[in-house]
Curated annotation (Swiss-Prot):
It comes from Campylobacter jejuni subsp. jejuni serotype O:23/36 (strain 81-176). L-ornithine binds at residues 156, 220, 224-225. GO terms for cellular component: cytoplasm. Belongs to the aspartate/ornithine carbamoyltransferase superfamily. OTCase family. Pathway: Amino-acid biosynthesis; L-arginine biosynthesis; L-arginine from L-ornithine and carbamoyl phosphate: step 1/3. One of its GO terms (biological process) is arginine biosynthetic process via ornithine. HAMAP family: OTCase. This is Ornithine carbamoyltransferase. Gene3D superfamilies: Aspartate/ornithine carbamoyltransferase.
């Protein structure tokens, strides 16, 4: 059974098909999942993710069931595999926002329903699908190729974008602080994919080098949820990595800025630049709804073929 845990498990054709279907559903809503049920499991708080999934299944004709950590026996020691067997047998889809990616893997092994990664410490694939739809809408993908820079932390967003760019054949540059590293295993996977797709991928510690000649600039919060006690240290380590007017001037003239939100002005992005690109950033957030719709339909179709 097909799950959506990481973009590593999806081909170029499948990823682009998801984005194209999302674009179609945005223009012409359809109730394609009448009476289907989505279980939403959250170990971490969420605004945009919960709204996107709950609205997506509802507008497609189904219903959502919200489950926080306090609602589950997992918090009392029940094995993940037992919870997966129960929930996976009762619903049509399971969406999970978890602290550890291993929880997703374990749940997917035992679930009879497809499992969707709505964020783990390693990957955030639904966000990248939303980003890709936004890039398509702003005409920043020429002949199937986008020129993208990621500036910031070597986190789940960076990992997911690295994988997507490698599979899709993009020109993709990463700039992270010197004492930060990309997972060697994820980097190796991306390099192998780049050989197949023709992607041009680079890694540096200089944001200006990464931004040169790019049409899309992506950044993310420096202090992720659960890292609040590391805020002071991380702000020092990321000094010089803010996306401001000077940084954007190095990118191509009409480059767009993407941010998965929440954004902290004065840290990863300046107030002026954020507001200048607010239209695209908030449309990026809205686009999560449509890519989730496309993803749910895809997984339902895959399950129907089994």
């Amino acid at each position: 059974m097909k799950h959506f845990l990481t973009l590593r498990d999806f081909s170029k054709e499948e990823i682009l098909s998801l984005v194209n279907h999302a674009s179609e559903l945005k223009k012409e809503p359809k109730k394609l999942l009448q009476d289907k049920t989505l279980a939403m499991i959250f170990e971490k708080n969420s605004t945009r993710t919960r709204m996107a999934f709950e609205l997506a299944i509802t507008e497609l004709g189904g219903k959502a069931l919200f489950l926080s950590s306090n609602d589950l026996q997992l918090s009392r020691g029940e094995p993940v595999k037992d919870t997966a067997r129960v929930i996976g047998a009762m619903v049509d889809f399971v969406m999970m926002r978890v602290n550890k990616h291993e929880t997703l893997l374990e749940f997917a092994r035992y679930s009879k329903a497809p499992v969707i990664n709505a964020l783990s410490e390693l990957y955030h694939p639904t966000q990248v699908l939303g980003d890709l739809l936004t890039i398509k809408e702003w005409n920043k993908m020429q002949n199937g190729i986008a020129k993208v820079a990621f500036i910031g932390d070597s986190n789940n967003m960076c990992n997911s974008w690295l994988i997507a760019a490698a599979i899709l054949g993009f020109e993709f540059s990463i700039a992270i602080p010197k004492n930060y590293k990309i997972s060697p295993e994820i980097w190796e996977f991306a390099m192998k994919q780049a050989l197949i797709s023709g992607a041009k991928i680079s890694l540096s510690h200089d944001k200006f080098e990464a931004l040169k000649d790019k049409d899309v600039v992506i950044t993310d919060t420096w202090v992720s949820m659960g890292e609040e006690n590391e805020k002071e240290r991380k702000i020092k380590e990321f000094e010089g990595f803010m996306i401001d007017e000077k940084a954007m001037s190095v990118a191509n003239k009409d480059a767009i800025l993407l941010h998965c939100l929440p954004a902290y002005r004065g840290y990863e992005v300046s107030e002026e630049i954020f507001e200048k690109h607010a239209d695209v950033i908030f449309e990026e957030a809205r686009n999560r709804l449509y890519v989730v719709k496309a993803l749910l339909c895809f997984l339902d179709n895959q399950r129907g073929r089994e």
